[in-house]
Amino acid sequence: MHYPEPISKLIDSFMKLPGIGPKTAQRLAFHTLDMKEDDVVQFAKALVDVKRELTYCSVCGHITENDPCYICEDKQRDRSVICVVEDDKDVIAMEKMREYKGLYHVLHGSISPMDGIGPEDINIPSLIERLKSDEVSELILAMNPNLEGESTAMYISRLVKPIGIKVTRLAQGLSVGGDLEYADEVTLSKAIAGRTEM
């Protein structure tokens, strides 16, 4: 179907978001057309602000307005434990349970040879550097329980073991093939409490 160019561009833009296909993008574009102009301007500004005002923490890799992030700056945190997660949504999920008091390291992905993503393509080198300089006694690997997450956890475990740091994995109360961000607080809390050494 032929749309006016501004609508076509908006549909194409919405389709760049994960999980948004042509029909949903079309619905969103026409909904945007029906919105008040002030709301559209505010929406567009929020999109631009996310890219301009946020950065990644130079210590852990988590999204932040200030570098280092509020978690790395918090002196009350247990600095002997680092929980390694795949992405920022996992940090947010872990923080919701309000039980984990250590630090984080965000990989921004997982090892996936099928997608051409190797260890050097995610935030693993900075993790190893961090472990050499910080006084860390335990590394909790909180990757998603899927093939890529398991591969990433095994790779990191093999790298870290020679350093002499205890490496643990979340308990397997999490469903295989699921994503950490969708787990409820109770499941995450039990997974942290029941973590096992690798």
Swiss-Prot record:
Any one Gene Ontology BP term: DNA recombination
Zinc finger boundaries on the chain: C4-type: 57-72
SMART domains tied to this protein: HhH1, TOPRIM
Keyword annotations of the record: DNA damage, DNA recombination, DNA repair, Metal-binding, Zinc, Zinc-finger
Residue span(s) of domain Toprim: 80-175
CDD domains membership: TOPRIM_recR
Gene3D superfamilies found in the cross-reference section: 3.30.60.80, 3.40.1360.10, 6.10.250.240, RecR Domain 1
Domain of life of the native organism: Bacteria
UniProt-recorded Gene Ontology molecular function terms: DNA binding; zinc ion binding
PANTHER family: RECOMBINATION PROTEIN RECR
Similarity comment: Belongs to the RecR family.
Its biological purpose: May play a role in DNA repair. It seems to be involved in an RecBC-independent recombinational process of DNA repair. It may act with RecF and RecO.
Protein name as it appears in the record: Recombination protein RecR
Organism encoding this protein: Staphylococcus aureus (strain JH9)
